């Protein structure tokens, strides 16, 4: 029974739970790697004893956090659990393919960890640039294992993307227009389309790297007429859409949370929010070379990529102001998820500001590969994506389990995490502006103060992570049942109880004349019997 339920599962709720648990476990590994890096960088001088080991930590931390934490939790976990509930589908379109999408991930993680255990490990950074990743500099099977790991994780994501696209378009009720789907469903649909377009390019790039290393081709070797810059173009054509893939489902989660806890019928500017996400997705594919301002692009290329990158700020700003307008005039219920959502808006906007600065090709010449860049993308990932994940977990935990979290503990954990991540990454702006380069295991004494502060902040963040584990354990142990507020009647995933039955529907829902929108207008929002805690 256990094996048939969890290994051969075709149930979207069980597979979503597997994704969430796997993502949490991987996230702990990634967090431990980051703590090791911050220990090395707390003071000048060597702690780990080898620059190669440090670079292996950097590489593994990035891969684990991106491919085995954020994507499985946001797309695999929340996507699987919520999308069938939100569109009234019995399950995902391809349930067995869904299961395979998940079970490709543990072997991929195993391959990635193995790459660190053999020879010297893959110390290339997550960008895997040749010639550093070539077989002269990284001899031995480490990089090959990392490449195979990426192949498996990529195959998993592509299969999942096909599944989500088919589900969102084909399995909603015939009378529900696309523009009546919840924003979270839209965000995952757009994310899946981006995955489907971006990942094959990465697969091509790393396959060429694999043959360069093992079959004596010279795609990226100038001696044979290749060009290492070609790899950078291929990699970043995947890599830039990837960072939007990481944040878009977070946008959907934040939209759900803010609409829910402000007691609004709908997010402000619902269609504009969808168009903004579409614009971000399209623009995300045409700005990749802003990661390459220092490799010697033409002046006109630099002008174009600077301008195009700045244009992405417009739809992003539309989303931020959409959230603020949703908050405006709402009867805000101050439960933990709205804390995470407000933290997301503030810190994601700060990260966006530094992104605008880095978009200037002239400034980026100086700031490229410094800690300024690290601070920028950790503000949008460590305080954007992760805050969205934490908000989603605290919001939907009662739906997934049927038990409520302790509000006092979750709020305390939010503040500890908030202080920790800001203390970790804000000083890194100063380090970058002072010229401290990324991916180095040691630094001049002049940088000691901010590095020490950053490391203290990372310890605080780690305490917050451990608190979150305790909070989940406490909720599952105390078993406080959920009392459903009527306010959830506009959020269709809550219709079926907490937790919903194992099989929510036996067939796709039927909806006459699009009853979805009018029902929203009939419900009064001023008299919600909210529970106190």
From Swiss-Prot:
GO terms for cellular component: mitochondrial inner membrane; respiratory chain complex IV. PROSITE patterns: COX1, COX1_CUB. O2 binds at residue 244. InterPro entries: Cyt_c_oxase-like_su1_dom, Cyt_c_oxase-like_su1_sf, Cyt_C_Oxase_1, Cyt_c_Oxase_su1_BS, Cyt_c_oxase_su1_dom. Disulfide bonds: none annotated. Residues 41-50, 118-140, 213-227, 287-298, 358-370, 434-446 are mitochondrial intermembrane. Binds 2 heme A groups non-covalently per subunit. Keywords: Calcium, Copper, Electron transport, Heme, Iron, Magnesium, Membrane, Metal-binding, Mitochondrion, Mitochondrion inner membrane, Respiratory chain, Sodium, Translocase, Transmembrane, Transmembrane helix, Transport. Residues 1-11, 87-94, 171-182, 262-269, 328-335, 401-406, 479-533 are mitochondrial matrix. Belongs to the heme-copper respiratory oxidase family. This is Cytochrome c oxidase subunit 1. It comes from Lycodon semicarinatus. The lineage of its organism: Eukaryota, Metazoa, Chordata, Craniata, Vertebrata.
């Amino acid at each position: 029974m256990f094996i048939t339920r969890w290994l051969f599962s075709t149930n979207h709720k069980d597979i979503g739970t597997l994704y969430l648990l796997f993502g949490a476990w991987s996230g702990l590994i990634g967090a431990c790697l980051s703590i090791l890096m911050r220990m090395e960088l707390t003071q000048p001088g060597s702690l780990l004893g080898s620059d190669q080991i440090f670079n292996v930590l950097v590489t593994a931390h990035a891969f684990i956090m991106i491919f085995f934490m954020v994507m499985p939790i946001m797309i695999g976990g929340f996507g699987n659990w919520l999308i069938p509930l939100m569109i009234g589908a019995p399950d995902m379109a391809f349930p067995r393919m869904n299961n395979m999408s998940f079970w490709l991930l543990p072997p991929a993680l195993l391959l990635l960890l193995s790459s660190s255990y053999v020879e010297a490990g893959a110390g290339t950074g997550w960008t895997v640039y040749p010639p550093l990743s070539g077989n002269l500099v990284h001899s031995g099977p480490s990089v090959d294992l990392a490449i195979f790991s990426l192949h498996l994780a990529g195959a998993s994501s592509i299969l999942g993307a096909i599944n989500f696209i088919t589900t969102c378009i084909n399995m909603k009720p015939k009378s529900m227009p696309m523009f009546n789907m919840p924003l979270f469903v839209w965000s995952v649909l757009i994310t899946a389309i981006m995955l489907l377009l971006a990942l094959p390019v990465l697969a091509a790039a790393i396959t060429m790297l694999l043959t360069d290393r093992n079959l004596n081709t010279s795609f990226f070797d100038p001696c044979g007429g290749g060009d290492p810059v070609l790899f950078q173009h291929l990699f970043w054509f995947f890599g830039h859409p990837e960072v939007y893939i990481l944040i878009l489902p977070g946008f959907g989660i934040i939209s759900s949370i803010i609409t829910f806890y402000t007691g609004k019928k709908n997010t402000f500017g619902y269609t504009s929010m969808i168009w903004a996400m579409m614009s971000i997705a399209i623009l995300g594919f045409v700005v990749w070379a802003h990661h390459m301002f220092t490799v010697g692009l033409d002046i006109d290329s630099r002008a174009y990529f600077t301008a195009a990158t700045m244009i992405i700020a417009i739809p992003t700003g539309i989303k931020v102001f959409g959230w603020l307008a949703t908050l405006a005039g709402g009867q805000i219920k101050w439960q933990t998820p709205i804390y995470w959502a407000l933290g997301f808006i503030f810190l994601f906007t700060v990260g966006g500001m530094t992104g605008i600065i880095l978009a200037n090709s002239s400034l980026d010449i100086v700031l490229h590969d410094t800690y300024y860049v690290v601070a920028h993308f950790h503000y949008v990932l460590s305080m954007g994506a992760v805050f969205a994940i934490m908000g989603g977990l605290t919001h939907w935990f009662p739906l997934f389990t049927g038990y409520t979290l302790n509000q006092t503990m979750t709020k305390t954990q939010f503040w500890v995490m908030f202080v920790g991540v800001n203390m970790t990454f804000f000083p890194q702006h100063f380090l970058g502006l002072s010229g401290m380069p990324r991916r180095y295991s040691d630094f001049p004494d002049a940088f000691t103060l901010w590095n020490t502060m950053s490391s203290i902040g990372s310890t605080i963040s780690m305490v917050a992570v451990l608190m979150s584990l305790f909070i989940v354990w406490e909720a599952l142990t105390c078993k406080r049942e959920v009392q459903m507020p009527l306010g959830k009647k506009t959020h269709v995933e809550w219709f079926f109880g907490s937790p919903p039955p194992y099989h929510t529907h036996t067939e796709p829902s039927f909806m006459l004349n699009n009853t979805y929108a009018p029902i929203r207008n009939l419900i009064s929002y001023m008299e919600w019997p909210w529970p106190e805690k």
